């Protein structure tokens, strides 16, 4: 399967931005801006915006995702949200293992794996984030590290479940910094992700996998990044908070 046959996915990660009323305005702007998209469009919002996002995107081509999910179905886990709670709202995707979760909230490769399996069991499509720090890149261990992150994240995930998994390469040094991996750097790691998935699940499964790049993708660099053969989409931070900028990236994915 070549790139043209894979599903390109542009997912906005709003992070801790937008109140419910602000979200309503942004979604109203997004709907017409991306209605002709030739790729799948996802917006991953704070929990407090999910109901608004789901209601306002009904009947449109925009899918809704959450930014995290707990690995238990229910119980005494104050402040947490389960996969069943999200799917009951109409949420389809969930971001798992974002570098900010790893940095600030003690996320580990093992908890990423637990969340991934819980998300899949609950009917969600996980967007699993992997990536290296600047120090790790300078040490030359990027590929080794990312391979390990992918292997642990997918431990216990079946080949059938893999069809609902997206993996996003997000170099930590490019998250929220304005720095971006070059298109060649992004391609190199996205290809390595596809290679390790091939070793685990076979070549056909690897060729079918959607691999995103996340890390300060914006209207200026999106087309070059998305033109690479192993970059199938983007996990977009800051640019997803402005409808016009997000739409430019969606258009670039359609071309790519």
Spans of model-derived segments:
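Active-site loop-to-helix "anion-binding N-cap" substructures in soluble metabolic enzymes
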Residues: 1-256
């Amino acid at each position: 399967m070549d790139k043209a046959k894979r599903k390109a996915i542009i997912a906005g990660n709003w992070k801790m931005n937008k109140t419910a009323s602000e979200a309503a305005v942004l979604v109203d702007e997004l709907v017409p801006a991306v209605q002709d998209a030739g790729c799948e469009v996802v917006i991953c919002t704070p929990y407090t915006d999910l109901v608004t996002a789901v209601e306002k995107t009904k009947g449109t081509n925009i899918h809704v995702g959450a930014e995290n999910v707990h690995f238990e179905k229910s119980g005494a886990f104050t402040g947490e949200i389960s996969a069943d709670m999200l799917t009951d709202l109409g949420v389809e995707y969930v971001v798992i293992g974002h570098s900010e979760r790893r940095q600030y909230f003690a996320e580990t490769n093992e908890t990423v794996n637990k969340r991934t399996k819980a998300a899949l069991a609950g009917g969600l499509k996980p967007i699993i984030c992997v990536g290296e720090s600047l120090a790790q890149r300078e040490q030359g261990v990027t590929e080794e590290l990312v391979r390990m992150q992918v292997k642990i994240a997918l431990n216990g995930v079946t080949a059938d479940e893999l069809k609902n998994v997206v993996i996003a390469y997000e170099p930590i040094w490019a998250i929220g910094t304005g720095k971006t991996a070059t298109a060649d750097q992004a391609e190199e790691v996205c290809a390595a992700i596809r290679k390790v998935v091939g070793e685990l699940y076979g070549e056909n499964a690897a060729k079918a996998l959607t691999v995103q790049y996340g890390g300060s993708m914006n209207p200026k660099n999106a087309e070059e990044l998305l033109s690479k053969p192993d970059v199938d989409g983007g996990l977009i931070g800051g640019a997803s908070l402005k409808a016009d900028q997000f739409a430019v990236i969606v258009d670039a994915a359609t071309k790519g």
